[in-house]
Amino acid sequence: MATSGSSDFNLDIAEVAEEAFERCGLELRTGYDARTARRSLNLLFAEWANRGLNLWTVEKITQTVARLSSSSSVDTYPIGTITMTVAASANFTVGETITGGTSNATASVITKPTATTMTITVPVGTFSATETLTGSSSSATTTLSSAISLETIQSTVDVLEVSVRRSGSDTILTRLSRGDYLAIANKDTQGRPTQYFVDRQITPTITFWPMPENSTDQIIYYRVRRIEDADASVNTGDIPFRFLPCMVSGLAYYLSVKRAPNRIGVLKDIYEEEFQRAASEDGERTSLRLVPSYSSLRVT
């Protein structure tokens, strides 16, 4: 007998829901059944973010730093890229603050990738489409073409390793706790960043110390993003195939809480076993090397 020669088996959201209902001893019949299954599946994905690192959700981000002058530099950046589409960006200056004429919202310019776009820091306030923007140091003006989306930034779960690149050479940065960053006496010191603080708000940010001393250094880091939502039933899940059994088992357990309480115990046990097996496989196969670090040691 010949083998199939294919290795592309997958389940769309509708098939995942059908399998989960069948494990509960039920059948998916109505539109509400499909809707409640998708809702439970999205809650399951949120729970996975709380269980630890899912390697397929790790993304590499490269961000250029921004400095306006020897006394003004951007130290806090979005974890990802916020792009502002405008009528013209040429006359604005990297590092300066822009203000919305109607909303009074503010943000700092990080880069100007094209003649009609700027990347900015997390806005303070909400910019309004078509309003006039004014630069604080250049006095340049332009019009905001469309509303700004923060969805990519808000999908960040956490940040992993961070480095700063200068002249092709990378240096690893050390992470500060909220208390350690607060204890820094002079947060306005400029230099090559050596440390960073991640503020895990709904719109998370990363703050560097010392503040960047130029607009050419690059910050390179890995961020952990959210698993994409289970929206349309024809979509497939944002997971590797190894997690298909785990996803189905987890959804079956979540549905049993609502529809088949007599099966909660056994379905929960199956789910926990499937998740542990998948999570154990979802790791990096590297040699263990322990290196002591004294960069953040403080003697009191």
Q: Each predicted region: which residue ranges?
A:
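Glycine-enriched, solvent-exposed interface loops adjoining structured elements
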Residues: 1-81, 143-300
